[in-house]
């Protein structure tokens, strides 16, 4: 925690062990994600309909410690309504289906993200998005007004190997800013 001079976000599974780590680290926020041992990366959002009551207790404990809690969810309205019930501060929309969509489905998946963003904002939560976003697909998502945070890691790090971290971040930021101002390329 001493190293991070900006906002620190911890992505974590909804386990007692991770809760202890979060309480010890005191990040500014946590994003609760599903964790399946067989996955290399998160392949979907939390299923809050089947979430145990202990998840609500975990959210309350983290909030009491001053940690903002975000739920990582697929763009499914049923799960978004559940996030409001758990009193999440924010929802991160899982954009994997959009990122992996072929040309025939990409507009449909983008509409799902837009509709989810509107519903999340309407319920009073902050809207974040991420998963599979890269330099060629980020602008339509960045243009969604309700989204206040994008989480992009792999694409930036991969580009940084070739161009350097500063240039990779600068290029991604430029794409996102252009999309916000209606100047998407």
What does each of the following model-derived ranges do?
Residues 44, 105-106, 159-182:
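C-terminal helical cap(s) of enzyme catalytic domains, especially alpha/beta-barrels
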Residues 1-10, 58-71, 120-130:
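Short beta-strand/loop segments at the ligand-binding rim of alpha/beta enzyme cores
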Residues 32-39, 89-102, 145-165:
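Glycine-rich phosphate-binding active-site loops on the catalytic face of alpha/beta enzymes
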Residues 8-12, 30-32, 69-71, 91-93, ...:
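Hydrophobic faces of well-ordered beta-strands that scaffold small-molecule active sites
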Residues 3-6, 25-30, 64, 85-91, ...:
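Glycine-enriched alpha-helix->loop->beta-strand junction motifs that scaffold or abut catalytic
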Residues 16-25, 76-86, 129, 133-147:
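Catalytic cores of alpha/beta
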Residues 68-123:
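Histidine/lysine/aspartate-rich catalytic loop segments that bind and position anionic ligands
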Residues 1-51:
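Glycine/small-residue-rich loop that forms an oxyanion/phosphate-binding "nest" at active or ligand-binding sites
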């Amino acid at each position: 925690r001493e190293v991070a001079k900006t906002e620190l976000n911890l992505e974590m599974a909804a386990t007692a062990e991770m809760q202890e780590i979060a309480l010890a680290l005191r990040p500014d926020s946590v994003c609760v994600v599903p964790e399946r041992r067989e996955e290399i990366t998160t392949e979907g959002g939390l299923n809050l309909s089947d979430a145990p009551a202990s998840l609500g207790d975990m959210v309350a404990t983290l909030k009491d410690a001053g940690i903002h809690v975000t739920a990582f969810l697929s763009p499914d309205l049923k799960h978004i309504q559940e996030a409001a019930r758990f009193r999440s501060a924010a929802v991160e929309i899982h954009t994997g289906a959009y990122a992996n969509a072929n040309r025939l489905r990409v507009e449909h998946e983008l509409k799902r993200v837009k509709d989810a963003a509107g519903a999340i904002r309407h319920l009073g939560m902050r809207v974040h998005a991420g998963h599979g976003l890269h330099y060629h697909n980020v602008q339509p998502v960045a243009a969604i007004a309700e989204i206040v945070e994008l989480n992009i890691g792999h694409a930036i790090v991969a580009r940084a190997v070739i161009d350097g971290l500063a240039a990779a971040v600068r290029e991604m930021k430029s794409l996102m800013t252009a999309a916000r101002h209606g100047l998407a390329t």
